[in-house]
């Protein structure tokens, strides 16, 4: 059963993968280890990324889906750690032309600890591919009512000119999505999908201007911009906060000068709890170790001074019930 609230860092399965055993692993502690052996005990879920190709014959950076499932699902169930299977991503597209293929795909990873299927739409998918995915989810969510189906979408965070904090535009809120996000939202409306969440990629806004983010001191304020993106989705598309999740990129983002700090984590988590959003994730688990500011790395945080698994633990603490 998918929990009402889900905190699950993204784990890029291709980073530090044990290619001999296909066991999802990490070097975040400085030593190559199965990821479950280094996951803090207060973090009970991971989002595993990314399955690409056609549903039912999907692969993970060339590893067959069946092989990856066989090597990892038993480990997650033995550890009683929940997981989301994430598809797509920036480097590859996930397609699904049939409901039978979607069933094969989901069943391959099924266990008591599978809590969600995530569709990360950022590889230039066609509108037809997106329409097909949404139609598959309409059927799948009836057959798998305990799973969460999320659409992870790139977003900007257009803010009120001159504002240094997020604030609601109300009915005049701009659309924060690119064409792919628009296509997802249109398909959800066209096909009447009800049981879904929208997971906003609150990162990489581009140049620091109010058309892109909440600006203070000439830089995008990453915590406030995450809040602004959520407000805009709520106000423009009418998505309730109870169907919304946020995924920042910790530390240095791909856009130079954008840095998501531990204080931004606190800001984001407070908004999430106050407004009843249903998920927080981040990109990505393997990056949660210090390295100096500079170009974004897939293996460290490009900010420094946070400590190994500092963001993982900060969010876990911030989001803990009763905090």
Locations of the language-model features?
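Receiver (REC) domain switch-region micro-motif
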Residues: 46, 117, 198
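Substrate-binding and catalytic surfaces of secreted/luminal carbohydrate-active proteins
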Residues: 49, 54, 60-63, 147, ...
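Solvent-exposed loop/turn segments at secondary-structure junctions
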Residues: 12-17, 50-55, 83, 88-94, ...
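Short beta-strand/loop segments at the ligand-binding rim of alpha/beta enzyme cores
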Residues: 2-9, 80-83, 145-150, 239-246, ...
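N-terminal carbohydrate-binding/catalytic regions of secreted carbohydrate-active enzymes
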Residues: 2-111, 265-279, 285-319
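Substrate-binding cleft of extracellular glycoside hydrolase catalytic domains
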Residues: 57-165, 170-190, 194
């Amino acid at each position: 059963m998918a929990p009402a609230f889900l905190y699950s860092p993204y784990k890029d399965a291709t980073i530090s993968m044990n290619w001999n055993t296909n066991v999802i692993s990490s070097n975040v502690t400085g030593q190559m280890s199965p990821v479950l052996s280094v996951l803090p005990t207060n973090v009970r879920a991971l989002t595993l990324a990314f399955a690409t190709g056609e549903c039912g014959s999907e692969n993970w950076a060339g590893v067959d889906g069946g092989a990856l499932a066989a090597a990892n699902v038993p480990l997650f169930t033995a550890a009683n750690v929940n997981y989301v299977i994430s598809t797509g991503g920036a480097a590859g597209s996930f397609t699904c032309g049939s409901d039978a293929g979607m069933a094969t795909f989901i069943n391959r990873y099924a266990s008591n600890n599978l809590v969600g299927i995530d569709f990360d739409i950022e590889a230039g998918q066609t509108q037809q591919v997106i329409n097909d995915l949404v139609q598959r989810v309409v059927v799948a969510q009836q057959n798998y009512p305990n799973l969460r189906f999320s659409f992870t979408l790139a977003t900007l965070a257009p803010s009120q000119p001159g504002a240094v904090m997020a604030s609601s535009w109300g009915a005049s809120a701009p659309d924060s999505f690119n064409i792919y996000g628009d296509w997802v939202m249109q398909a959800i409306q066209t096909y009447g999908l009800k049981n879904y969440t929208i997971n906003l990629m609150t990162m990489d806004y581009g140049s620091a201007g109010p058309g892109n983010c909440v600006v203070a001191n000439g830089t995008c304020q990453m915590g406030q911009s995450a809040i602004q993106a959520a407000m805009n989705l709520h106000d423009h598309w009418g998505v309730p906060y109870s169907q919304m999740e946020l995924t920042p990129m910790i530390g240095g983002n791909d856009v130079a000068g954008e840095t998501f700090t531990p204080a931004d984590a606190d800001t984001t988590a407070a908004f999430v709890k106050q407004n009843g959003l249903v998920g927080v994730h981040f990109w990505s688990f393997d990056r949660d170790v210090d390295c100096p500011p500079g170009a974004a790395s897939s293996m460290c945080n490009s900010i420094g001074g946070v400590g190994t698994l500092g963001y993982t633990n900060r969010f876990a603490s911030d989001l803990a019930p009763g905090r």
